[in-house]
Amino acid sequence: MAPKIFIDGEHGTTGLQIRTRMAGRRDVELLSIPEAERRNAAMREDMLNSADIAMLCLPDDASKEAVQMVSANNNVRVIDTSTAFRVNPGWAYGFAEMDKEQAEKIASARFVSNPGCYPTGAIGLIRPLRAAGILPDGYPVTVNAVSGYSGGGKQMIAQMENPDHPDAITAPHFLYGLPLTHKHVPEMTVHGLLDRAPIFSPSVGKFAQGMIVQVPLHLDDLAEGTTMESIHAALVAHYAGQEIVTVVPLSDSKALARVNAVELEGKDTMKLFVFGTPGGSQVNLVALLDNLGKAPRGVQNMDLMLAS
């Protein structure tokens, strides 16, 4: 019998992406609530408790409510795409390439929290340097990023694409999270192995999908003897054997005149770059990915859990 999968929130941006990716699969059975019944709490609870894996594509509070509905049913495993459980020690963090052991932790977990799009890029750059002893305690990390507007969900998509929307956004690029209290900062801190919260400055561009995350560093403030080449080597070693996360060779990065935010639109992969001048005192670490990566991450984590 095929495992039963219920996507709670299948009509939202992330839920639709996951459902599209799973269309046509015969190895799983997709449970579904008709859109007209999606606010039927009794039907929703029944679907959640009938599933082998419940994939939650909901706002934080609704995800917490869904988890309560299945908390007593050990037959149901959960993948959550909200921010509600990403730093909860009782949940496996769903970034399988983050460490060598992470895929196994996901595979054996009952509860898995999908990583956010910005944190995936930031953690992907920062964690290997912390693990290698290159990035010292107390370093004032800065993370700058630009995302496609689809990351803002249906409301922002309408604001960006419909000029007649009452709150239409016409700017080609804008900053937000101006008080520096973005909800992804705790996630970056915990899973980036940082002892000090980074300054995070997110922004949105007038393109639907894609993302660039930047972490600039002063070499003189890192571990003694750190160079652009040693940082690159640490990233290469950390992701050796991985197919989803790739580290671009320094020679290829040097040949680039620009980085295109939409290059990986619709793809599951992430590219990491190290930019700078050989012998210089600064480097800029860059992660390139699709901002809607929660969808492929969710399916990847589901496959890991089903294979266990």
UniProtKB/Swiss-Prot annotation:
Record EC number: 1.2.1.38
Record keywords, A-Z: Amino-acid biosynthesis, Arginine biosynthesis, Cytoplasm, NADP, Oxidoreductase
Cellular localization per UniProt: Cytoplasm
Classification via CDD domains: AGPR_2_C (cd23935), AGPR_2_N (cd17896)
Principal EC category: oxidoreductase
Family stated for the protein in its record: Belongs to the NAGSA dehydrogenase family. Type 2 subfamily.
NCBIfam families: argC_other
Name of this chain's protein: N-acetyl-gamma-glutamyl-phosphate reductase
Source species: Rhizobium etli
Organism lineage string: Bacteria, Pseudomonadati, Pseudomonadota, Alphaproteobacteria, Hyphomicrobiales
